[in-house]
């Protein structure tokens, strides 16, 4: 079973930029873990979202204990911004800006 969530607009109450999108993904089949599928999925989703010229930033918030997800997002170009408190508990706030995305594409 796979879950992919996209949110349009504000992810955090402090976020006022209408071009921000939030993502979350889950690969629930344990036999699929560790094969790079999550990273491929996130990279493809980031590229799809940045195809929209209005998208300025993509953000996500994995649990600090979910080291596999944090590494997946880092490999896909997200950077840690710090730890935030959410209704679900603490989370690692991670972002990828359009500028960073375009910079990595031009380096490739």
UniProtKB/Swiss-Prot annotation:
The family database entries (PANTHER family) matched by this protein are listed as: LYSINE N-ACYLTRANSFERASE C17G9.06C-RELATED
From the broadest rank down, the organism's phylogenetic lineage runs:
Bacteria, Pseudomonadati, Pseudomonadota, Alphaproteobacteria, Hyphomicrobiales
Instruction: Please cite one Gene Ontology biological process associated with this protein.
Output: response to antibiotic
In terms of Gene3D superfamilies, this protein maps to:
3.40.630.30
Start and end residues of each N-acetyltransferase domain: 1-99
Q: Which domain of life is it from?
A: Bacteria
Keywords noted in UniProt = Antibiotic resistance, Plasmid
Q: Which InterPro entries match?
A: Acyl_CoA_acyltransferase, GNAT_dom
An MF annotation (GO) of this entry:
N-acyltransferase activity
PROSITE patterns for the chain: GNAT
Q: What is this protein called?
A: Kanamycin resistance protein
Q: Which organism is it from?
A: Rhizobium radiobacter (Agrobacterium tumefaciens)
């Amino acid at each position: 079973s796979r879950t992919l969530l996209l949110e349009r607009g504000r992810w955090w109450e402090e976020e006022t930029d209408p071009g921000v999108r939030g993502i979350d993904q889950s690969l629930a089949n344990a036999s699929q873990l560790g094969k790079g599928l999550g990273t491929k999925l996130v990279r493809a989703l980031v590229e799809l979202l940045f195809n929209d010229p209005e998208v300025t930033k993509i953000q996500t918030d994995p649990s600090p204990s979910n080291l596999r997800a944090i590494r997946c997002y880092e490999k896909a170009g997200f950077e840690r911004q710090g730890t935030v408190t959410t209704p679900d508990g603490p989370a690692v706030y991670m972002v990828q800006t359009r500028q960073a995305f375009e910079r990595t594409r031009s380096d490739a």
